[in-house]
Amino acid sequence: TPGIIAWYGSGDDGNPYNGSERLPQYNTPWAVSALGFGGGWTDIATWKVLGHNPGGLWGVVLHLKDISFMEDLKHTLRAGYYHGTNNSAMPKAANMASYPSRIDGPFAYLTTSDDAWELNADTRYKIYENLELAVEAAYVRLNLDEGTWGKKIVNEVDKDSYRVSIGLKYSF
């Protein structure tokens, strides 16, 4: 089943003293992608690479769900692109000495000069009626602007995040 998900979330302006213009958030996975926003089948952690909600960025995710060439075997493929909506003057105005590594995830604050992209491949195999095997692979690439964050921060931040997981689920 092909699908597309797109959104726009407001971001901060360049003034750190007039309150945040970002969308308020509740700390829960937003299952748009497997690694970036916490939609993975074996994902039990609350930490997400890109955060928990769409605040401060716009994005597009294309997916092909439930691809099947064999009975009881299904695949899902996703590709996502995310671009910040926070003003690129904010990091300097707020005296951010390092890239924010918030509880939402290390890539959770993107400015209008920053972007990230993600690829996911998920496979599920129903071994028995009550037993299912899942294999997930996900990769996120962060692209930070050196003019916004400075050379030191851009060079220090890990820009590649990936996960490969295998899980079994037994249903009673």
Q: Language-model segments: which ranges?
A:
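Residues on the lipid-exposed face of transmembrane beta-strands in outer-membrane beta-barrel proteins
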Residues: 4, 62-66, 121-125, 166-170
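Outer-membrane beta-barrel domain signature
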Residues: 48-53, 108-112, 146-157
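Outer membrane beta-barrel transmembrane domains
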Residues: 88-122, 126, 134-136, 140
